[in-house]
């Protein structure tokens, strides 16, 4: 799968499911939303008051799962790196109405932005047995 196909899959399927290891050591899954891509990095955001933030700090290895209308799905795993660049935070705030309503400003101290490093992708087709693995 090519990097532009991966990016389009994220954009075309706005709800992704993020899997973490909970504070109790058990898996946790919740809906998330891809924010933007910059220099080959996939960016997401959260609030540092949420449990998911603490879970990621405790174990930065996560996996996203995204399914399209054809029931094909993309698994994306990697290591979370928190980004402090105000330029990225500003782009996210300016491009997402809901995020702007929640955080008001890119310098809100609870607004956290992260990207994935050591990223692996696995495309799975309902009609096929094989997985296609790739990197961005």
Give the role of each language-model region.
Residues 24-26, 79:
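Residue-level signal for well-ordered, solvent-exposed loop/turn and beta-edge residues enriched
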Residues 35-71:
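A short mixed-secondary-structure module that forms the rim of ligand-binding clefts
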Residues 17, 42-43, 122:
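General beta-strand recognition
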Residues 32-35, 78-80:
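Hydrophobic/aromatic beta-strand elements that line small-molecule binding cavities or substrate pockets
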Residues 1-17, 134-136:
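Extreme N-terminal tail/first-helix region
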Residues 75-136:
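Charged, gly/pro-rich active-site loop segments
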């Amino acid at each position: 799968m090519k990097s532009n196909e991966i990016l389009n899959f994220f954009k075309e399927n706005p709800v992704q499911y993020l899997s973490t290891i909970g504070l109790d050591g058990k898996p946790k899954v919740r809906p998330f939303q891809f924010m933007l891509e910059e220099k080959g990095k996939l960016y997401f955001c959260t609030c540092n008051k949420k449990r998911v933030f603490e879970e990621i700090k405790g174990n930065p290895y996560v996996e996203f799962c995204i399914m399209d209308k054809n029931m094909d799905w993309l698994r994306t795993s990697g290591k979370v790196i928190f980004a402090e660049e105000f330029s990225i935070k500003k782009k996210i705030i300016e491009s997402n109405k809901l995020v702007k309503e929640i955080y008001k400003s890119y310098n809100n101290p609870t607004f956290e932005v992260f990207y994935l490093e050591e990223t692996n992708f696995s495309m799975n087709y309902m009609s096929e047995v094989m997985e296609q693995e790739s990197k961005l």
